[in-house]
């Protein structure tokens, strides 16, 4: 059953996207054996200007290596590439709302950004919006809570529509 999700993910991409991912995968698969090893993964990160310890690389590999064979195959590589671009977009959106860069989004920060985007809502609406995702009860939205909010757009739409 787990492979069904991966297969449907692969079917939703265009052939050109698949070809681009294959080219990138082949570039990182230095020895051409069809899989990326820990050392090749280290070279991937170095090429992007980041270096990690072997322990950190092994942790990254463990997260990506769906079939637990100690390597990243092309399917696993494609899956992580697709999901990481989404994660980057969510991080960028969080940073947009986090006006004072303290790692938390307040109701007034949400209010300012939504109003700039042309959405009409009150600070009270934003407080209610935060209340739906504020699992730690601090009255703010941290990154984890923001991810939850972004994956449930009905929270935003419902709160703003009810104003």
Curated annotation (Swiss-Prot):
Gene3D superfamilies associated with the record: EF-hand
CDD domains referenced in this protein's UniProt entry, alphabetically: EFh
PROSITE patterns in UniProt: EF_HAND_1, EF_HAND_2
Molecular function in Gene Ontology: calcium ion binding
Domain of life: Eukaryota
Protein residues bound to Ca(2+) 2: 65, 67, 69, 76
Residues where Ca(2+) 1 binds: 29, 31, 33, 35, 40
Residues modified as N-acetylalanine: 2
Keyword Acetylation tagged: yes
EF-hand domain mapped to chain residues: 16-51, 52-82, 85-120, 121-156
Alphabetically ordered keywords of this record: Acetylation, Calcium, Metal-binding, Repeat
InterPro entries: EF-hand-dom_pair (IPR011992), EF_Hand_1_Ca_BS (IPR018247), EF_hand_dom (IPR002048), EF_hand_pair_protein_CML-like (IPR039647)
Binding residues for Ca(2+) 3: 98, 100, 102, 109
SUPFAM superfamilies: EF-hand (SSF47473)
Positions annotated to bind Ca(2+) 4: 134, 136, 138, 140, 145
A cellular component annotation (GO) from this entry: cytoplasm
Pfam families: EF-hand_7
Reported function: Potential calcium sensor.
PANTHER family (alphabetical): EF-HAND CALCIUM-BINDING DOMAIN CONTAINING PROTEIN
The protein's name in its UniProt record: Probable calcium-binding protein CML26
Organism of origin: Arabidopsis thaliana (Mouse-ear cress)
Gene of this entry: CML26
